[in-house]
Amino acid sequence: GAGVTGIVMSQDCVDMYNPKVVRSTMGAAYRVPFCYVDDLAEEVKQMKEAGICTYAAHLEGKNSYDEEDYRKASAFLIGNEGNGLRDEVADQAQVYIRIPMKGQVESLNGAVATAILTFEAARQRR
């Protein structure tokens, strides 16, 4: 994998024990710690206070994801493809980043965006 140490999700995210999720993750859902929180914006605030740099994958990101340094403790904030991140969560991010697109594509689904960002972080940490 990409070396992810944990996943924090809002209560309205997918059920990680859903059989389709377990199948699509090939069991990784059981190997990476995860939790659901009631107030994701507050969790992001606590991450920042703990020295974790928070990056929002956002259409308004000025820097491309591959221009940032992820060698330090990092958290990626990923929204769903229909609505993106909720404003109150995105507002807590320290840095807005974008994944450049070609052609008519406006956004990627959350799994694809997460894979791109986490594997870039893993590449930098080698």
Give, region by region, the residue ranges found by the protein language model.
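Structured adenosyl-cofactor binding patch, chiefly the S-adenosyl-L-methionine
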Residues: 1, 16-29, 87-126
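RNA substrate-binding interface of SAM-dependent RNA methyltransferases
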Residues: 1-61
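Short secondary-structure transition/capping segments
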Residues: 19-21, 46, 66-69, 110
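Short flexible/disordered coil segments
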Residues: 49-51, 70-78, 116-126
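Active-site/ligand-binding-proximal alpha/beta "capping" segment
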Residues: 55-105, 109
